[in-house]
């Protein structure tokens, strides 16, 4: 019996980087009366929380390197953070080698984006690239998936994801959404067969892929506008 339902945000509950709409919020409210709900995201907890309009829910961020527990008194999140030291010289050298190998030597801004948590982003077009250029670079992810295995091998100490529109996101091992969700479930007394995960990015290199390939029940949402229909079809509100 499912007791804990976890959700991705962008593409699953919302359009990318847009606010949670009323219809999907109402479905979450109905689900919260029957199940324990949690968000599992690639971004920071407070960004996810704000995008959801302060919906009362725990939020796991940065692939499990951040956890926000909803505080009913403050109507906000109490944040716990983990961080892993990053060898910036090594990372920079490895990214540079990949650029030279695949011809990505022209870029705007920084070669690598380093995050306080220890996560890193390899922005193929650079950290200050034009938004339109980023959107046009690899809309179907085929260019990045073509070199994905090589990037994974070069960064074997990280879990690598085909992120955004023109980058690779990397989290220090063992952090990924599966690790984060299983850890949260164990801390809250849930077994794997009591969990369902709802996500859209389950393809090769996607940040939901690790959960999709696990034994956790996975609910595919390929269009966030169909989220209510999919939830009803799965029988969660019957």
Predicted feature residues:
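Conserved acidic, metal-coordinating active-site core of Asp-based
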Residues: 101, 106-196, 204-207
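Active-site phosphate-binding/coordination module
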Residues: 18-109
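A general structural motif
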Residues: 1-2, 34, 56, 117, ...
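Residues at the C-termini of beta-strands that transition into short coil/loop
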Residues: 60-63, 164, 222
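Walker B beta-strand of ABC/ABC-like P-loop ATPase nucleotide-binding domains
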Residues: 6-7
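Mg2+-dependent phosphoryl-transfer enzymes with acidic/Ser/Thr/Gly-rich catalytic loops
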Residues: 1, 20, 171-173, 177-238
């Amino acid at each position: 019996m499912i007791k804990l339902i976890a959700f991705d945000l962008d593409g699953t509950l919302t359009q990318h980087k847009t606010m949670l709409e009323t219809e999907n919020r109402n479905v979450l409210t109905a689900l919260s009366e029957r199940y324990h709900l949690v968000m599992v995201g690639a971004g920071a907890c407070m960004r996810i929380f704000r995008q959801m309009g302060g919906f009362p829910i725990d939020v796991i961020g940065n692939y499990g390197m951040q956890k926000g527990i909803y505080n009913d008194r403050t109507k906000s999140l109490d944040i716990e953070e983990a961080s892993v030291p990053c060898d910036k010289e090594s990372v920079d050298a490895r990214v540079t080698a990949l650029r030279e190998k695949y011809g990505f030597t022209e870029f705007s801004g920084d070669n690598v984006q380093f995050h306080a948590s220890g996560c890193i982003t390899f922005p193929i077009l650079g950290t200050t690239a034009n938004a339109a250029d980023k959107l046009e670079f690899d809309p179907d992810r085929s260019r990045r998936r073509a070199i994905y295995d090589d990037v994974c091998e070069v960064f074997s100490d990280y879990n690598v994801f085909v992120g955004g529109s023109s980058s690779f996101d990397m989290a220090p091992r063992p952090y990924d959404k599966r690790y984060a969700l299983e850890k949260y479930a164990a801390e809250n007394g849930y077994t794997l067969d009591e969990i369902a995960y709802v996500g859209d990015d389950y393809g090769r290199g996607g940040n939901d892929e690790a959960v999709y390939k696990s034994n956790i029940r996975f609910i595919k949402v390929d269009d966030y506008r169909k989220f209510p229909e999919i939830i009803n079809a799965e029988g969660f509100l019957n």
